[in-house]
Amino acid sequence: MNKKTIWITGGSTGIGKALAIKFASKGWNVAVSARREELLNELSNTYENISAFPLDVTDKLKCNEVFNQIINKFQSIDICFFSTGTWNPKKEKDIDIEQMEDVFKINFFGTVNSIKAVEKYFRDKKDGIITIVSSIAGYRGLPNSTGYGP
């Protein structure tokens, strides 16, 4: 029987890292992506089932490239867990538009880029799971988050 494979973005820290370790401990192939290559390499050197695929999700072409690298290595992907995100709270008087644009590029468009990289594959396969970690800010404003939320 073939091992199942999960692709996790935002896998160098936090929820993504914890999930990568959990799935690796259950015997899954874990493809972990994030910008910080040194943290990914630390994970892949520590856990046999974890493989590092460095990625900046704001780069559409790179998302597709990494997806193809994962397929080439493992022959399939069963679950995608997209947990890439950033947050930099600021009071309204201190908002930096460029910084806000970066938050949207990573949190929103990065997730869209990741989904677009796998959607045709899952449709053709007629199987697969995409899970997205989101922010409560989509439901309720947070302190010092004037530019991000409802």
Regions found by a protein language model. Name each.
Residues K91-E92, D96-F104:
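Substrate-binding pocket helix/loop in short-chain dehydrogenase/reductase
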Residues G10-T13:
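Conserved glycine-rich cofactor-binding loop
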Residues K93, R140-G149:
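Active-site loop immediately N-terminal to the catalytic Tyr-X3-Lys motif
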Residues K26-L43:
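Conserved glycine-rich Rossmann-like NAD(P)H-binding loop of the short-chain dehydrogenase/reductase
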Residues S83-N88:
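Conserved NAD(P)H cofactor-binding loop of Rossmann-fold oxidoreductase domains
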Residues S135:
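Residue(s) in the substrate-gating loop at a strand-loop-helix junction
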Residues L55-E65, I97:
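The beta1-alpha1 cofactor-binding region of Rossmann-like NAD(H)/NADP(H)-dependent oxidoreductases
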